[in-house]
Amino acid sequence: MIIEVVLERLDVKHDVFSKIQTHRKKGSIVTSNTSTIPREQLVKGMSESFAKDFMITHFFNPPRYLRLLEIVSGSEVSSDKVQIVSDFCDINLGKEVVVCNDTPGFIGNRIGTYWTLVGMVEAFKSNLTVEEADAIMSRPIGAPKTGIFGLADVVGIDLIPHVTNSMISNLAKSDPYCVAYLEQEELGISQLFSDMVDAGYTGRKGKGGFYRLNSSSGSKVKESRNLKNGNYSISIKPKNLQSVRAAKRGLR
């Protein structure tokens, strides 16, 4: 089984697939770790034999902690091969496998990217700090404690534009995701991502992201980024947020 995990760009993936197609053993299964690109586009231009052996296995990030894995196959892929991949991911890798339709973002990112996008838009409009936004958009709604900005740091801020472009290129302009994206553009959030990446702030794998650890004083101090001016200051956990208190009590 060959798993492709390169950049979330269709042209880059096609280049890798062409090389795999030349060297792979006949009948070997090939999968892509794409998080948003439809399978139909991934196999376009590839041989019929390649398409019969090709599926999507979307590992959620970070894969060493998150159990969820999405599988997307096609009508030309035999059910036996789908079962082989599903069993391997379940038994050998310990994943919780969900078989999805071939739609933009599949299930997880069709919901997750929209939720994150809208959350960031509302944070900007409400003048929230990244800590306030993450406190609200995390445990109180049953989401991971990273929230939205912390999650962006984990995933990689440099990856976000590629994921976004993949989604908007495969959805109707009237889709709520595309509508929210236009609002993000107007608020300057897309430009913020670009500026951060250019400066090396790609998240945890870089100099930091919306959060960073500053060790200039000799000890590591957690700092957060001001969404308006881009400056960093000591990260302060918000207290007495009404929505957080309500979540702890339970919605009754």
Where are these regions (language model features)?
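N-terminal glycine-rich phosphate-binding loop for ADP-containing cofactors
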Residues: 1-252
